[in-house]
Structure formats: structure tokens, C-alpha cells
Design a protein with these regions (language model features):
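Disulfide-bonded cysteine-rich modules in secreted/extracellular proteins
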Residues: 145-150, 169-187
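Alpha-mannosidase-like glycoside hydrolase catalytic domains involved in N-glycan trimming
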Residues: 37-167, 290, 294-298, 302, ...
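Sec-dependent signal peptide recognition
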Residues: 2-8
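Surface-exposed loop/edge segments in extracytoplasmic proteins
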Residues: 98-104, 202-207, 384-390
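Bacterial Sec-dependent N-terminal signal peptides
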Residues: 10-38
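Extended, beta-strand-rich, solvent-exposed assembly scaffolds of outer structural proteins
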Residues: 178-268
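Extended Gly/Ser/Thr-rich low-complexity repeat segments
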Residues: 131-141, 263-277, 335-337, 371, ...
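Catalytic cores of extracellular degradative/oxidative enzymes
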Residues: 298-299, 303-821
């Protein structure tokens, strides 16, 4: 692979009322909104700086060091507008000191052949403490020509990883005998339950008297009994034992030792209740074992990766990065069946400094003994201890990472020219004119410092994804990401990157040991990881310890790592994108998703929206040369094909553009339709021709319900209502309603439109998270994707909902706007 310094070549390698149904079909496909001249965008100072008018784009590099840095090699992701960077175009860079060595990697292209996203690495020199320097990126060869490739040397001191893996006893107490929602034999008021826990000569006794909401045999009361024991056991000072209640554990109570290596114990119970209680043994105690990957093994793996170009991420004169997969072996040379170290090793300055992104995964899909693991971990560079992790429980199918530096750490922050980055269509256009108060950013930092952000913990995230109500991770992007995109403030960045890391603890990560990639439906079309049962040939091994903090789903899923990857280019975030997109497809009953097709329509409409977003994010972010690029592009195309074939003129669907609610096919939540429209609008804007037919179809309902007050009596005040009935019964048959006037009168009989009709209160018209705000984002995205009426409708709706503007100042999650230029 050719290396470039002052010139980087973008090298791509393979890898209305009363109308008839037909009146609602767009006559032509809507095209993307015409974009402004690039120089006009680059002159926008919303990010605090402007780019040279002849540049393609620019970024600001800020030193965070207390002393001068002779060299400051940086890598960042850069989105490009369609057509701005055709395939094969050379790039070069300059800053205030002159020419800057530049390399290009990780190129993702659009259907038109132009670059959507690339990873840029630049070698800045003599960066002073606190200095802010503009890095201008230009198209074409550098005036001085290209420079020779850099020779990289493997450091003499390698990275070693040691994990002491514990196998503490795990017992489980199950209270009662309920059958689903049918109560079992009840616990009566005044009955006493006693648990006696014994280890050697030490005994702990814990008793709970049944009273109040503990009385009964339903899962609600049984859960409260389990919680009563949980709180009592864990509150004991200097106790030996720990109670576990995580996720949807209901009437079950896990029991183990606080120190994982202490030994076995017994559980005895006494009660005067007729309701049954049982004790199950889930895991027997076993002595701890040391597993390790040595520095010698790491150095050899790195040398082989360089010589054979194995698992490359960055290859050029500024930086070279490869992914190393290091099995952890015990004294007998046996690799741990589940725990593995992955190291994204980036060599800089020829290898004089190295950035190791150490990733610990408990994620192999088909390896034996899946389940939660308890271990401590130490990492060393040579003899220097650089990471010392106390014993903790690593959830099944989860991962975490830490960045370790060998040699001087590069201390610099890259800030993007957001007007250009958002104009690219790769990320949503947020309102860069919002003046986010210092108090809001300070509060974000204070809350983050107080949150539990340890390994496998949740921070600001809601572990039970299905919890009702708006929250900060649900939106086009999470609140913390929106805050960062608008402000590029370090405190918002810390919140965004922290939560991008925390979602690694969610048990959705299934890696195929054969491909070393996320579990795919080409190899395993009959697998399911979430519901129902896999086909025998694709069945996953059973887990003995699967309780976690988390209960993930698709309908309440955030976009956690797309923007972090787009801005940083880090492999960890790219892998995370793939894991979430894969889990969304792999979770369904195989027959419902079309086996290997990976169809997403069985999910409720909001879930279809977020799953399509995740799938689109993976497909758009993955470099063209990545082995999984074609896989995700194909699944995205499969879903477009299904939607375009299903939602068409003459089909058994709403001719007004409402999607089918799989759980109640006579109604639709307009907000859910808006979620879906928001996503397909972005995919259409970002270059997917297959996205246009389904975008046009859903836009009939999404934009149309704001446009038919005058001609069909569909009052704008009701446009963002909670749920709307869109099906009627005719001669005993259910048929879609085919005109706006009838839809409105079916849902609001006798209501007429006038200026005094208040906005539907169910839309929360003064909230930053309500359905009225959701509609704003959808209308803006639709305008950006080329809908001819959406921009005017957006402006009308903004004027009708002024309270949202103030709400956006503290929570801009839904503050998507039309393009600035």
C-alpha cells in the first residue's frame, strides 16, 4: 500500500381531503436539496473559526499539553459533502507553519463514487502549550510533492496482559411459584423467611417478615421479597456475602461472596410459609487461575501484522495501526474460552511512541462456557504497571477498553468545522445558533462526575431500555452528543465519549471466532440472540450466569457510537457500530426476518426506525475495504427493497403514507412515523437511491398531516398527536382510510380547525423531548432530503411551537434544523 506524507491519495480498494389513493403517490422521486457553494459554508464561523475559501475543509487543533510538543501526530475522522472529493483525488494539508504531512485511510464512498468519510492523520510540528492551530485540507497534490514512506520499528518493550480469573460460587434463591402473570401460592402477612449463609465457621443469618407489599404470590410481591433480602445482605458491615439483583431478575436473588476467591458456602432456609422457596446452584466454586498474554507474544504479533499487513486500520507515513488479537492462556497453555484481549496498536513517529487501545472482550458467540466472568487485570509495558483493575464482574457478551501510551502521549484535541461536517449529510444538521449556557455545560460535568461510570455501569443511560417516557439517549443522537456537536466543549465531549464506552457493557456483543467479526447471517442464518429459538445448526451454547444490569431492546435504542467514530476514527467505536447493527438483526425469530436477509420490519415502528439508523450507520461508516462493508450494505439494501415493495400504490397499506404498526395495525403513532421518516431522510440525503421511494412514501403522512388544514380540515394543532386511527371497517373488512378529512374526523369527531384550537397536549408542545419537537426534527430532515414542502412546513411549525426553542437551550437532543446554507 502506497504511503503518502505531504500528499495523501484517496485510494479505494474493494472491499388533501377526498382524493383517491393514487393522488398520494409522488409523481417523481424527490431529489436532495441543492447545496450551497463550498466556500460559503467554509466561511461560516459557527464553530469559532473559518476555513480557507479554496480548502475542502479544515479543523482546529488545540494543544492540551503544559509544554511544547516537537511533533503532534493526530488522527481524526472527516465527513465530506457529496461530490467534494471524487475517488482518487489527492489531498494535502497546511497550517500556519507551512506544509503538514498528511495520510488518508478508512475511506467510505457513496454511490456516486465520491468520498463520504475518511480518516485523516496529520503530523503537526512544534505545537506550543495551549496553542490553537488551524489545519487546512486541500484537494490536489502538495506543491512540494510526496515524501517517502516511514519505516516503523516494533518497540523493544512489549505489552503484557495478566488476568486472574475467579470462579466464585453463585447460588440463586427463587421465591414463590407464580406462573407468568398468574400468582402462585401467596406469602401471608406475618410469615417469616430466614436465610442462613455459612462459610467454614462463619455464619450470617438474614430474616424478612412478610408484610405490606411483600404479601401475595404475584411477581410484584415476590420481587419485593427478593429485594428485601438483597438490601439486608448488602447492608451488613464487614459481611462475607453479596446479594445480586440485576436486570429482569424479579423473584430471584443471586448469592455469592464479596471477595471472589474466598471459597464455597452453604445456603439454608427456614420459613413458616406454605409458598415454596428453592435454592439453585448456578456455579460451583473453583480456585482462581492466572491467564496471560506475554509481551513477547504481543511484539511478535505486531511484527507479523506490519510485515504481512494484517488487520490494518491506518497505514501511512504519519501513523500505522493494526489490530492484534491476543489469547489469554493459563499455565498449561490453554486459552480462556471467552476472555480475550484485542489491542489496536498505533505506531507514531516511526514507533518511538505507541498508542495501545486495549480492549477486553467476553464476547465469543460459539465458544464454550459463555457467561459473566469475575477477574482482576494488570497490564504492563515492559516492567511498568500501566493498568491495575481490581476484581469485578465482566458481563457476558460485553467489552471495555482503556487507552495506554508507550512513550509521550500526544496531547491535542481536534475540533471540526461543524457547518461543513453537518452540510455533508453524514451527521444531522443541528442548530448551531443555539446558545448553550455555561451553566448547562457545567452541570453536565458535575452530573458526570457523580454518576456511576465504572466498568459495566450505566452512567446517564437507562439500563432497562423499555422504560417509558422521553430520556436523554433517545433521539437522532443522545443529548450529550447533540451538546457536543453544537458547542464542541470538552465537558460535553467527555460525556459523549464516556457513554460511548459504557455501552460496551451492554450484553449485545457476539463475535464469531471463525471470522473474528460480529456474528453474521451469512454464516448463521438461523441464529437468534434475543427471542425465540435458533435453528439447531446455529444454536448458541447455553449460559449458566447471565444476569446483568441491562435489559436492552431496539425500540428505545440510542445512537451511541456513530459520532464518536466519525470524529475520532477509533476502531473500538467502529466495532461497536457493527455489534449493535448486527444484534438488532440477529435478535429476531429467523423466520420473521427472512433468515439471512436481516429484515427489520417485525419490530414496532420506532424500533424499525432506530434499527435502520444503526444499520445505516454501520454501512456508511465502514471503510470500503473492510471485510464487513458489503455485508451491512447488503442488509441495508434488503430492507430498502422490502419497504419499497411493501409501501407502494395498490398495496394493502395506508395510501396516506402511514406505516403499519405490527402490534396494532389500525393505528399509528405519528411520532413513530416521524422517527422512521427522520432516519430514511438522512439515508436519502447521504446518497442512498434506494432510500428515496420509502422516504417519499412516509413523507406523505409525515409532512402531509401538517398541510391539509385548509383543504381537508386536518387541523395542524392535532398533527403531532400520540396515536391516530388510520384503518376503518367496510363490509366487515378492515381497509385503510384514504383521505385526510376522514382520518381527522375518525379521530376527532366534530372538531373544526380555528386559530384558537390549542396544540394537542399529548404532543408536549413546550418540551424539548415531546412529539412536537420530534416533528420539528423530522420536518427539517425531510427538507434536507429534498421534500419540496418540508422547509415551509418546518418554519410554520417552529412559529407554532415557540416554547421548544427555550427548551432546546438545555436539551438540544431534537434540535435538528434545515441546512444552514
Amino acid at each position: 500500500m502506497k504511503n503518502w506524507i505531504m500528499t495523501a491519495l484517496v485510494a479505494l480498494t474493494g472491499c388533501g381531503g377526498g382524493s383517491t389513493p393514487t393522488d398520494h403517490a409522488p409523481a417523481t422521486l424527490l431529489e436532495p436539496r441543492q447545496s450551497a457553494a463550498r466556500a460559503q459554508i467554509l466561511a461560516d464561523s459557527a464553530s469559532g473559526f473559518v476555513c480557507a475559501p479554496e480548502a475542502v475543509t479544515c479543523v482546529e487543533v488545540s494543544s492540551t499539553a503544559s509544554s511544547a510538543q516537537a511533533t503532534a501526530p493526530i488522527t481524526f475522522g472527516q465527513p465530506f459533502r457529496s461530490g467534494d472529493l471524487p475517488t482518487g483525488t489527492a489531498l494535502h494539508a497546511q497550517d500556519s507553519t507551512g506544509a503538514v504531512p498528511l495520510q488518508v485511510d478508512g475511506v467510505s464512498t457513496r454511490e456516486d463514487g465520491s468520498v463520504r468519510l475518511a480518516l485523516l492523520s496529520a503530523q503537526l510540528r512544534n505545537l506550543q502549550p495551549g496553542e490553537k492551530r488551524l489545519l487546512q485540507v486541500f484537494a490536489g497534490p502538495a506543491p512540494g510533492g510526496s515524501m517517502p514512506a516511514t519505516s516503523y520499528t516494533v518497540p523493544s518493550e512489549g505489552l503484557s496482559v495478566q488476568a486472574t480469573v475467579y470462579k466464585p460460587q453463585l447460588s440463586q434463591v427463587v421465591f414463590g411459584n407464580r406462573n407468568g402473570h398468574t400468582p402462585g401460592t401467596p406469602f401471608q402477612d406475618g410469615e417469616v423467611i430466614t436465610l442462613t449463609l455459612t462459610m467454614g465457621e462463619v455464619t450470617e443469618t438474614h430474616s424478612v417478615t412478610v408484610t405490606g407489599n411483600l404479601v401475595g404470590g404475584a411477581f410484584t410481591s415476590l420481587t419485593q421479597i427478593a429485594w428485601a433480602f438483597h438490601n439486608q445482605i448488602n447492608a451488613r458491615a464487614n459481611g462475607l456475602f453479596k446479594a445480586i439483583k440485576e436486570g429482569e431478575s424479579y423473584e430471584t436473588l443471586g448469592l455469592t461472596t464479596r471477595e471472589p476467591g474466598r471459597g464455597p458456602f452453604t445456603v439454608n432456609l427456614q420459613t413458616n410459609s406454605a409458598s415454596p422457596i428453592r435454592v439453585d446452584s448456578l456455579k460451583a466454586f473453583a480456585a482462581p487461575q492466572l491467564y496471560q498474554a506475554t509481551a513477547t507474544e504481543q511484539r511478535a504479533a505486531l511484527q507479523a501484522a506490519i510485515e504481512q499487513n494484517l488487520k490494518p486500520h491506518l497505514v501511512g507515513a504519519v501513523a500505522r495501526e493494526h489490530t492484534l488479537v491476543l489469547p489469554l492462556r493459563n499455565a498449561q497453555g490453554q486459552a480462556h474460552p471467552q476472555l480475550a484481549a484485542r489491542v489496536h496498536t498505533r505506531l507514531l513517529d516511526g514507533g518511538a511512541r505507541v498508542r495501545h487501545d486495549l480492549v477486553m472482550e467476553n464476547a465469543w458467540a460459539y465458544n464454550p462456557e459463555p457467561g459473566n466472568l469475575t477477574y482482576s487485570l494488570q497490564a504492563r509495558l515492559g516492567n511498568q504497571l500501566v493498568l491495575d483493575q481490581a476484581p469485578f464482574t465482566h458481563y457476558h457478551h460485553a467489552r471495555w477498553h482503556r487507552v495506554l501510551w508507550q512513550g509521550p502521549e500526544v496531547k491535542a484535541v481536534v475540533r471540526h468545522h461543524m457547518p461543513y461536517a453537518m452540510a455533508s449529510g453524514v451527521i444531522w444538521q443541528y442548530n448551531l445558533d443555539l446558545k448553550i449556557a455555561e451553566r448547562t455545560l457545567a452541570e453536565e460535568a458535575t452530573r458526570l462526575a457523580a454518576a456511576n461510570t465504572g466498568l459495566m455501569q450505566s452512567g446517564f443511560l437507562t439500563p432497562y431500555f423499555g422504560t417509558t417516557g422521553g430520556r436523554h439517549e433517545i433521539g437522532p443522537y443522545p443529548r450529550w452528543t447533540a451538546l457536543y456537536l453544537i458547542t464542541q466543549d470538552d465537558r460535553a465531549r467527555a460525556s459523549m465519549m464516556t457513554h460511548a464506552d459504557l455501552v460496551g457493557g451492554v450484553p449485545i456483543h457476539y463475535r464469531d471466532a471463525v471470522t473474528d467479526q460480529p456474528l453474521d447471517l451469512d454464516r448463521h442464518p438461523g441464529v437468534t440472540v434475543r427471542v425465540a429459538t435458533s435453528a439447531p445448526a446455529d444454536a448458541l451454547p447455553a449460559m449458566s450466569d447471565s444476569g446483568t444490569l441491562w435489559s436492552p431492546d431496539i425500540a428505545h435504542q440510542g445512537s451511541f457510537t456513530f459520532v464518536p467514530y466519525v470524529l475520532t476514527g477509533d476502531v473500538y467505536h467502529l466495532d461497536e457500530l457493527m455489534f449493535w447493527a448486527a444484534w438488532n438483526m440477529n435478535g429476531y425469530n429467523p423466520g420473521y426476518r427472512g433468515l439471512g436477509l436481516g429484515l427489520l420490519h417485525p419490530e414496532q415502528v420506532r424500533g424499525q426506525a432506530w434499527a435502520m439508523r444503526a444499520l445505516g450507520e454501520a454501512a456508511r461508516a465502514l471503510p470500503d475495504a473492510h471485510p464487513m462493508k458489503r455485508y451491512f450494505e447488503t442488509r441495508l439494501a434488503n430492507n430498502f427493497a422490502w419497504y419499497n415493495d411493501t409501501y407502494k400504490v395498490g398495496g394493502p397499506v395506508s395510501p396516506l403514507g402511514a406505516l403499519v404498526n405490527p402490534y396494532q395495525d389500525d393505528t399509528i403513532g405519528p411520532w413513530q412515523n416521524d422517527f422512521f421518516g427522520l432516519v430514511v431522510a438522512q439515508l436519502a440525503q447521504d446518497g442512498y437511491a434506494q432510500a428515496r421511494p420509502i422516504f417519499n412514501w412516509v413523507s406523505q403522512f409525515n409532512v402531509g398531516r401538517f398541510m391539509h388544514e385548509a383543504d381537508a380540515g386536518y387541523c395542524v394543532a392535532k398533527a403531532p398527536a400520540y396515536y391516530v386511527k388510520v384503518v376503518k371497517t367496510v363490509d366487515g373488512k378492515r381497509v385503510p382510510i384514504d383521505n385526510w378529512r376522514e382520518v381527522f374526523q375518525t379521530n376527532w369527531p366534530g372538531v373544526t380547525c380555528d386559530a384558537n384550537l390549542p396544540l394537542d397536549p399529548s404532543s408536549y408542545p413546550g418540551s424539548s423531548l415531546g412529539y412536537a419537537a420530534n416533528a420539528r426534527a423530522m420536518l427539517a430532515a425531510s427538507a434536507n432530503a429534498g421534500h419540496p414542502d418540508a422547509l415551509a412546513v418546518y418554519r410554520m411549525w417552529v412559529a407554532r411551537t415557540p416554547g421548544i426553542d427555550n427548551a432546546f437551550l438545555t436539551d438540544p437532543t431534537w434540535a435538528v434544523t434545515p441546512l444552514r446554507h
